[in-house]
């Protein structure tokens, strides 16, 4: 019998909180504006994290165009959008259209193709993260070619190039059916356009899955993947705006979903915006935080609760009102 021995040294020390400083200007990030979000990944596999900044495009202001920024590993980023192959779709004249963003019959003037969200995910399992862009009226899937360039495969992959009512503010990659390939859920902020789930077929194409019976049309802003009932199948939690209940889609072993937000105590009708997962209480259970126009919420499960319901700890831990 072989034995392995480990020496353990216990050290005591005083710990101080970390200090942060704004390096926007020194990192060449301060010039970009009208930004709707950022997606982080090591797209070129060089060991450091790169950025895709998704922006509301203004034809007469190049600083408002979406950008792919490569991390130079010295505290700076360089704009590689043009050489990446993504620029062909981003740096072009965008038409102004009248659009009912909120589904309330009031039309706003927007730029067709406004970038609203970005999400990295390796949909073809080649080790290189691919990029999905959620836009107004259209969306885009870019395949990472592994050499610093991308190819627009939106059409060939089975996604709508043009969708009349869509306003995709969130894109969530997850393997909902556990077949080893990332699927994608799209949160749509237009209540006249449903949220969508696309199943990855494993051959670089996707099929649209009907989830209309479990996810009603709403002003959905974002979505995260959690394990609400502690099985192996990921569930989907959706933040909805305008006093609508948030939605919790419980995965039915990869065969469909059932909406159960009220059952789990996470309906949270406070004008949902952002979502983030964490384990704030170190119980090895996935908790999540909801940022709202109204009060924020921090949900965690009671490990002794056989019903898997959640408790909102936001007031208890002082993250209820973050200003």
Predicted regions and their residues:
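Acidic, glycine/proline-rich Ca2+-coordinating loop motifs
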Residues: 1, 17-323
């Amino acid at each position: 019998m072989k034995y392995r021995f480990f020496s353990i040294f216990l050290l005591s020390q005083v710990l101080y909180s970390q200090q942060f400083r704004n390096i926007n200007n020194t990192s060449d990030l301060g010039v970009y504006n009208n930004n709707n979000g950022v997606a982080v990944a090591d797209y070129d596999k060089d060991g450091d994290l790169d950025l895709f900044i998704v922006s509301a495009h203004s034809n007469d202001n190049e600083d408002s165009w979406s950008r792919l920024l490569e991390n130079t590993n010295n505290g700076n980023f360089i704009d590689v959008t043009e050489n990446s192959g993504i620029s062909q779709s981003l740096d072009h004249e965008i038409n102004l259209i009248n659009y009912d963003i909120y589904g309330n019959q009031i039309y706003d003037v927007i730029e067709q193709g406004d970038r609203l969200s970005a999400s990295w995910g390796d949909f073809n399992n080649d080790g290189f993260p691919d990029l999905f862009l959620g836009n107004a009226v259209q969306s885009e899937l870019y395949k990472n070619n592994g050499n610093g360039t991308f190819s627009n495969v939106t059409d060939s992959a089975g996604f709508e190039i043009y969708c009349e009512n869509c306003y995709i503010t969130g894109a969530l990659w997850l393997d909902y059916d556990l077949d080893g390939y990332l699927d994608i859920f799209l949160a749509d902020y237009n209540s006249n356009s449903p949220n969508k789930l696309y199943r990855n077929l494993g051959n670089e194409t996707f099929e649209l899955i009907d989830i209309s019976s479990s996810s009603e049309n709403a002003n959905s802003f974002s979505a995260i993947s959690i394990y609400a009932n502690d099985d192996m199948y990921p569930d989907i939690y959706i933040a909805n705006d305008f006093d609508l209940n948030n939605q919790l889609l419980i995965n039915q072993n990869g065969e469909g979903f059932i909406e159960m937000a009220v059952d789990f105590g996470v309906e949270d009708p406070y004008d949902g915006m952002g979502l983030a997962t964490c384990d704030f209480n170190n119980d090895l259970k996935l908790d999540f935080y909801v940022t709202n126009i109204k009060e924020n919420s921090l949900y965690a499960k009671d490990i002794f609760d056989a019903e898997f319901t959640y408790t909102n700890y936001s007031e208890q831990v002082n993250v209820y009102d973050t200003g």
